[in-house]
Regions:
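Hydrophobic/small/kink-forming positions within alpha-helical transmembrane segments
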Residues: 25-33, 60, 83, 87-91, ...
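C-terminal-most transmembrane helix of multi-pass membrane proteins
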Residues: 2, 7, 252-301
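Membrane-interface interhelical linkers
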Residues: 1-23, 56-81, 130, 192, ...
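Specific transmembrane alpha-helical segments of multi-pass solute transporters/efflux pumps
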Residues: 27-30, 68-103, 145, 222-237
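Hydrophobic transmembrane alpha-helices of multi-pass small-molecule transport proteins
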Residues: 131-147, 167, 269-288
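C-terminal transmembrane-helix exit sites in multi-pass transporters
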Residues: 95, 112-134, 205, 252-271
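Transmembrane alpha-helical segments that form core, pore/gating elements
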Residues: 33-36, 44, 59, 150-209, ...
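Helix-helix packing/entry segments at the starts of transmembrane helices
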Residues: 106-111, 177-190, 228-259
């Protein structure tokens, strides 16, 4: 154990950060696979609620270790908006994962970087030049390529895009709140509000989970928390410009999980469109992190 720890610490920050981020993409993909499996048994609103609830429970020890004084805030309304947008994003994200192939849901989720560009320009006064406009149009073309064989946008596709837009809004809220509040404060209020918000639609479609479903719900939530933790650790030790492209390996893991667990085989147009979206998103992330990096490490799928 000691030798393994020394070997790990002897690696460069880039290597350690890359390992953490790659591990997070694997765990997020497994979480999505369990969510999709649960979605065939219970409603997506119920799956989203338990993900939010157990996520809140799992982060409580970390939050309270920082002390209750760290939960004070002078911007409760902004926390409320951030939590509501986050809760809506969780519900949309789980609906998309359950009703779309996992690879498609993952690829459409990456469009959050494209939504972030105009939002950051409007709310954070960041640059919005011709090159970034072209990048957004390229990403939109990728979305159209993915949906063309289906004869248009499915409802689940629109929900996936809405989730990406909501996540982009959450990132803006995080950027504004992080200047005055601690990470523990951000995580606590966002998790609590998201759990309360998702509880309402969950009650409308409630179905008592079986013993197996309870185990799957707990495992899914634990995977989400572990993935989030790995993601944060990765970005804590290495630069975002190096790590951000690695996040897109999630598409490969999601495609593998979809194939082996559900028999989903990505079509040629879907993979081509996903490649365009990923390329456009990588360009946005690289230009964003060179100017004003804004990452939301507290909102998981």
């Amino acid at each position: 154990m000691v030798r393994a720890n020394m070997f790990w610490l002897g690696q460069s920050a880039i290597v350690r950060g890359a390992v953490w981020v790659l591990l997070s993409t694997v765990l997020f993909s497994l979480m999505g696979a369990l969510a999709k499996l649960l979605g065939s048994r219970i409603d997506s609103f119920q799956v989203a609620f338990f993900r939010a609830l157990f996520g809140f429970i799992f982060i409580l020890p970390v939050v309270f270790r920082a002390g209750l004084h760290g939960l004070q805030t002078r911007r409760p309304l902004l926390h409320l908006w951030r939590g509501m947008f986050g809760g809506a994003a969780i519900m949309c994200s789980f609906y998309a994962m359950i009703h779309l192939p996992l690879a498609d849901a993952a690829a459409l989720g990456f469009t959050r970087a494209l939504f972030l560009v105009p939002l950051a320009a409007f709310f954070l006064n960041e640059k919005f030049d011709k090159r970034r406009i072209f990048t957004i149009l390229a990403g939109l073309a990728g979305v159209i390529m993915m949906t063309a064989p289906q004869g248009g946008f499915e409802f689940a596709t629109l929900v996936a895009l809405l989730s990406a837009a909501l996540v982009a809004c959450v990132v803006i809220f995080v950027k504004q709140l992080s200047s005055t509040d601690t990470p523990a404060t951000l995580i606590f209020y966002s998790s609590a509000i998201a759990a309360l918000m998702t509880a309402v639609p969950c009650m409308l479609v409630w179905k008592q989970p079986t013993g197996v479903e309870w185990l799957l719900l707990i495992a899914m939530s634990l995977l989400g928390v572990l993935a989030q933790s790995c993601f944060i650790r990765g970005y804590a030790v290495a630069e975002a410009t190096v790590l951000a492209p690695l996040e897109y390996t999630r598409l490969l893991f999601a495609a593998a999980a979809g194939y082996f667990m559900f028999g989903d085989v990505p079509g040629g147009w879907a993979m081509a469109g996903a490649s365009v979206i990923i390329g456009a998103s990588i360009h946005v992330v690289r230009t964003q992190t060179k100017t004003a990096p804004i990452q939301d490490h507290s909102l998981s799928d």
